[in-house]
Amino acid sequence: MGTGWRRAFCTTAPRNSDAAAPDLDKQRTGYNLTPSPSPRSCVKLAFLSGGSNPSTPRSTSSPSLRCRTADAQTPTAEQTSTPRSATKSPRLSLAAISNPSSPRSPLKLSLFRNSFKFRSTCGICLNSVKTGQGTAKYTAECSHAFHFPCIADYVRKQGKLVCPVCNSIWKDASLLVPHKNATESPLDDSVSVIQEKRVVVTSSPRAKPRPKQSDYSRFYDDDEPLLSPRFVTIPEADENCGGEEEDDVPQFKGFVVDPNPSFAVKTNEIPVNGRDFGNVQVSLLPEAAVVSVGCGYETRAVALRVKAPPPLTARGGVGRRLLDPSQRAPVDLVVVVDVGGTMNGAKLQMVKRAMRLVISSLGSADRLSIVAVVMTVPKRLLPLKRMTEHGKRSAGAVVDGLLCGQGSNTSEALKKASRVLEDRRERNPVASIVLLTDGQGQLSKVHTNQRSTITNVGSTRFAHIEIPVTEHGFGESGGCSNAPAEEAFAKCIGGLLSVVVQDLRIQIRVGSGSGPCEISAIYLCNGRPTLVSSGSGSVRLGDLYAGEERELLVELRVPSTATRAYQILSVRGLFKDPSTQEVVYGRDQSLRVPQAVRSSSSPRIERLRSLFIATRAVAESRRLVEYGECTSAYHLLTSARALLGQSGTVEAAEYIKVVEAELVEVQWRGQQLMEYQSQHQQQHNQRRRGSERETTTTMTLMDENGEPLTPASAWRAAEKLAKLAMMKKSDLHGFENARF
């Protein structure tokens, strides 16, 4: 009677009795080595242990599940010998909180209690994170709370943004990113930003491994942000409220827009930095060529030259002064360095010196990226980074680490450079790509005094922005490190960086007081021959560097009765100021077309005629190829080649090669188009045969009522036929031997 209440509880023992036998002595002395919770913890979680008595010792000597009874009021020595630190240890895992062997252990409830515990306590130091204790609190995306110094120290040591409690990946942890990147070197941080993101994803043991991204699916949007914009203070209402501001307000002239607005520039619109951005020179060459004579009219060709103004520092004659960042707009520059098999020894050293010159010439507002042509896969060694002191040190370390490799793929490197500029998040007013190579395997050199349609300057356009691609070759004499070569390279880089005209547009029309004539077409000679306008209209030339020239070929159609009259062309344009991004309107200029002579042996006129024939043929053939008319394009180029061959001059022979090269390309495109059409026709025929076969099969599987033929419908049809046969037989019963 005095023993008090007794409680029955269930315990589990391991299956291996031999391994559990040596542990009996330790259990008797008060040390519990089983994964079951301690007696003090079972008191707190009695509802999870099935009502067990915390004062009863547990035995694991038996390999079976059995019940025991113990006195609830008599404390044993084994209970008192349990360490207090072990009973109040806050580091209780999920296995220690809930007994998985008990049939009454609610796993969901234990998970909820576990998650609720880590919301009110720090997941690292396991102390309370309640407010008012003088320590900042950080709550992660997974709802786990931490002390900010604890989680910052954890991220700094581990180098990854993963929850230490549930191992979930944190996507939005902007406060912890500086602590994650604190121990990384500046060069590694600037070179492998995208690789670090992959490491974070794959470092979590619960994260699924992602397939490696290909080079073409990678986005280069890790460019360094631009300088913070300057805030311009807005004056109050009582400041500068003179009567002069009211005079500058234009009067309302009605809702009818003037079709011919004035493009004159006011004196206060011209920048005050010493450069006259409105001084874009537009002139006609002093010769005009008669291309063809038709019934009642003749076709003439004139060349229009557009030249950008030179920079102010060019007057001093010092090439390095062209690189002054204060005299130009900020630029995003991508340098493609060829470090193939031919760029070894002295050439590689000269490339490094040129790169150091480029780095030193850029300012803090400029950004630089480096792409190396290595083997067949180009590599981006440096993202778009502002050329501050830290950025210049990072770029210099990349340049010093350049080594000569084997093979080169310049076209893929230029594609990657274009991707770098396409994927950038922020944009400077000017963007440029520079290719540094020895020139071997690239475009062949052209003669200096030749008006060739293929030059060393091309352009890659995207999103209405022109990215000029410039190739600077070192040639066989690349090892000669003399001062004039570096001075010439400094002038070249200075000209590339000094964009003085941006998004230039020119409108050409017949001026007032001109003789009867008509503008048939306008062709662009520089780069790829292109039809930029059919008739009078606006011509977009894009960005112009300091002192850069562009040539346009204007096709005029003059009546035969007005061949002796003077024709006048009116030219006006507009562009953006690269430094201020303001639109500058140019003044109207009237240009007098020179008189053309039908029969002339002048080399300049013959060269102009040959240039016009080749440019027009190439431009029109490309336009026809875009519409899929390769045969017409081939006949057009063949006629142009025959027409150039009739003159027999040296100038015509040079342009015949250009037309023949275009003929080869048109033939190749025609073959590709024929193969595509044949494959498309075969696929169409296969689809049509398949549809006919399906239609035939469907028709054969239909009954007389148009319903699909199934076993049930076939059985019903057979029953119907059997009934009809029986009815006919019954109707003829008794008339077998009858004669009618």
From Swiss-Prot:
Name the Gene Ontology biological process terms. gravitropism; hydrotropism; protein ubiquitination; root development
Instruction: Give the coiled coil ranges.
Output: none
Question: Taking every annotated instance into account, which residue ranges of this chain make up the domain VWFA?
Answer: 332-476
User: What residue spans carry the Polar residues bias annotation?
Assistant: 71-90
Which stretches does the entry tag as region Disordered?
14-105, 677-709
State its Enzyme Commission number(s): 2.3.2.27
Annotated protein name in UniProt: E3 ubiquitin-protein ligase WAV3
